[in-house]
Amino acid sequence: MSSLSKEAELVHSALETRGLETPLRGQALVPEVRKARIEEHMTEVMKLLNLDLRDDSLAETPGRIAKMYVDEIFSGLDYSNFPKITLIENKMKVDEMVTVRDITLTSTCEHHFVTIDGKATVAYIPKDKVIGLSKINRIVQFFSQRPQVQERLTQQILIALQTLLGTNNVAVSIDAVHYCVKARGIRDATSTTTTTSLGGLFKSSQNTRQEFLRTTRHV
């Protein structure tokens, strides 16, 4: 990972140390090779489904899926895509909660490879550094662009921000609809799943925790 940014390496190391990194096999193939291999295998899957790839509507589907997997919905598996992070010295001595609400996210359930669609609320109490607000959204999006379970996704965002900001005072909450529940199995179209991960004062201080939870509209 020598070509990665310092921030990407720090976050990856922190997640590995805590056993919260997405399970990976090791050194990945270069993107173009991955796309070619996925296209080959997806062609076979579609044939096994008895689809006729000579039809002009289906002919390019294996290639489209391969490109989508590598470049888009699973791009967060590659730390070279980790967002460029802007950290600013906390010269104003901000010591109150900073909250970004309703961050849209789309991820993929790693059990069935169907959509997870939700929103995240992220808060932190600055110490020595503050982060550009859009970078919080980008970090949420980066970890969403992987096969995921919502519990791990919530914790990965928390650990990433704690690592970058140099403070434990971070909180993350995610509300999401899981299409593995909505579109198959029980086929429940109305239920949502909420996960919360709290650090520092958000865990130890009841007042701070309640203030955060009020921003998520859970209490």
UniProtKB/Swiss-Prot annotation:
The keyword Cytoplasm does not apply. InterPro entries: GTP-CH-I_C/QueF, GTP-CH-I_N, GTP_CycHdrlase_I, GTP_CycHdrlase_I_CS, GTP_CycHdrlase_I_dom. One of its GO terms (cellular component) is cytoplasm. Pathway: Cofactor biosynthesis; 7,8-dihydroneopterin triphosphate biosynthesis; 7,8-dihydroneopterin triphosphate from GTP: step 1/1. Zn(2+) binds at residues 109, 112, 180. Keywords: GTP-binding, Hydrolase, Metal-binding, Nucleotide-binding, One-carbon metabolism, Zinc. The keyword RNA-binding does not apply. This is GTP cyclohydrolase 1. The lineage of its organism: Bacteria, Pseudomonadati, Pseudomonadota, Gammaproteobacteria, Enterobacterales. The gene is folE.
